[in-house]
């Protein structure tokens, strides 16, 4: 991670994720300042509901149909755990990954989310800029409310991937892929299991 925050060069960035956790902890305990976003994942949905217009919240939180897939995904995720190894030297921490020949400082990616104009006026452009600032690859949805070119420009030197809902028309597919390549998207993420719009 860089020693300054890219969007504000005068603001020092935490040197690593553990330091950021310590910063949040110290700020809350010593100064009574809570983080803007909750650190409890079970409270994220309630916080989003309080912050978003109802239409926006319902779109992202509702799932499809009876939410069976959404519920199953959450249950599956809960079965994963970090198992610490005791009495080991942990002074050299590495959480980075290499994907498609590129090394990233973090294993985190920004998943594709379409129609972001219903969440914030900055749309996908704003999120792409934020991802570039912190070095997280941004995956743009085919269903984005910003254009491929806008996101490409907003990303600057940041890594950007393009998610494709495969169109029925080959000419449209070629056009999307050509525009993405020209705009600096380096990885293609293909969604194959969305044959029709879900009941939302």
Residue map of PLM features:
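Hydrophobic faces of well-ordered beta-strands that scaffold small-molecule active sites
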Residues: 108-111, 138-140, 160-164, 188
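Short, acidic/turn-prone active-site loops that include or flank metal/cofactor-
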Residues: 144-146, 164-168, 194
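An N-cap/entry alpha-helix motif that binds or orients negatively charged groups
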Residues: 3-101
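A glycine-rich phosphate/pyrophosphate-binding beta-strand-loop-alpha-helix module
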Residues: 121-160
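A structural motif shared across PLP-dependent enzymes of the aminotransferase-like
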Residues: 65-68, 118-123
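Conserved, mostly hydrophobic/aromatic
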Residues: 53, 110, 131, 190
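Alpha/beta enzyme core
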Residues: 115, 129, 153-154, 168-200
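Glycine-rich phosphate/pyrophosphate-binding beta-alpha loops
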Residues: 112-118
